[in-house]
């Protein structure tokens, strides 16, 4: 009896978007600006790190990798949000599974990478003499690849299980993109589905709590070392090295924790969407700002390249002919 019902739903319809054309346009314009800023801002960071050899250090290698992940993390959801605001609000069942997979896989990659970055800061401040011999370029590459492997493997069992569930009721998804809990609510309710929802909650809890504990352990050691530094300038330098990462960590994990560590707690649709926007849109939006405005070396490198671009474009067409 399940197979006929299962095939009745071939697509989901996002019902959380405004139906008014004016409201849709009002939402579309800032979202388009934010997405463009995220892509361009992160591409600038990647390019600046690649073009400046003095930035080829573990910290900037990880920042560059995080910027690359941010582009794909937002691309998994925002383009579909933009099209849903102005046109068709449906997504195929397979498309929904793919969106969930890439959104969560890139998100888990970021969680792992933020944890690795905290460990990198810990080594740089707590073991500065051994740091160059430990955090080699080879190890940086291995850690980055390990984060990606972990991220792209972890969601596979959940996605595979959801693909086997029967969906025999409403296909109206009360969310702005495909996510585990909103999709699971549309599955035909049975004991197995209820138990698996709880299992998904536990999996998310383990992932988030493990990462948060490791990061806080790293920062606990960092703070202890910083407090032992006698020079105020030295303390300021050491603190500024970590503050950008900690702000990014707080923004991302704060909203993710509210969304995925609620267990039986329920929010209104408004708060569900607000929290989802916080970690899917706003957190990636602030990351390029934090890493560029709070990082002296990246700011100086960007200014240098802007200056070079101004010189290049200020050369008049007749100048080259005069040289020859």
Swiss-Prot record:
PROSITE patterns for the chain: G_PROTEIN_RECEP_F1_2
Membrane topology of this protein: Multi-pass membrane protein
Record topological domains on the Extracellular side: 1-25, 76-98, 160-198, 260-272
Disulfide bonds: 96-188
Cytoplasmic side: 47-54, 120-138, 219-238, 294-324
An annotated GO BP: detection of chemical stimulus involved in sensory perception of smell
Compartments where located: Cell membrane
SUPFAM superfamilies on file: Family A G protein-coupled receptor-like (SSF81321)
UniProt keyword terms in alphabetical order: Cell membrane, Disulfide bond, G-protein coupled receptor, Glycoprotein, Membrane, Olfaction, Receptor, Sensory transduction, Transducer, Transmembrane, Transmembrane helix
Membrane spanning residue stretches: 26-46, 55-75, 99-119, 139-159, 199-218, 239-259, 273-293
GO terms, molecular function: G protein-coupled receptor activity; odorant binding; olfactory receptor activity
Residue positions the entry lists as glycosylated: 5
One annotated Gene Ontology cellular component of this protein: membrane
Source species, domain of life: Eukaryota
Main location class: membrane
Keyword Iron tagged: no
Family matches, as Pfam families: 7tm_4
Homology family: Belongs to the G-protein coupled receptor 1 family.
Function: Odorant receptor.
Protein name: Olfactory receptor 6K2
